[in-house]
Amino acid sequence: MRFRGDPRGTRHLIHEFLSPLANRRDDGYGGTLLQRMRFLIEITDAVRDVWPEEKPLLVRLSATDWVDGGLTVEDSVGIARRLKLHGVDLVDCSSGGIVAAQPPSVGPGYQVPLAARVRQEAEIPTSAVGLITAPEHADAIIRTGQADLVLLGREFLRHVYWPLDAARELGAQVEWPEQYARAKR
């Protein structure tokens, strides 16, 4: 399966437009949430125009800035609703990036509640990220409907066979690619 995912939503220009902490513009791209999301919507429309309809389009959002006066998960629900209207198939929910503030507590799955809330309230599929390392944890996130997809970053870099090992740990029968047979434990 091929898809287009846009990782630029976290700690990058698009998030700088979305966050009221960074966006101090006084034109059509600043001010209200609707105006701050204008740049993202224009990019989304341009990508959707050239991206095949049968392939999913994903957008990463930094769902909260974790500080007063910053982007909130409520804002992100509104953004996700608008993205859905513009052809986005899934919102990947991350957090932070504008200021050095950290979430109240960082631990396995600490961003999962963001994905769950956006999924439920915006009625759009979401992906969960953030210190998800155990196959059972990833499986539980999907099975309980907190997200539709779990994305791994650092864990996959540390353990490139994670998907194959996770499938085995969860009792799924998978065939390892022939080239990887010697790496199978």
What kind of feature is each model-predicted range?
Residues 1-185:
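Flavin-dependent oxidoreductase catalytic cores
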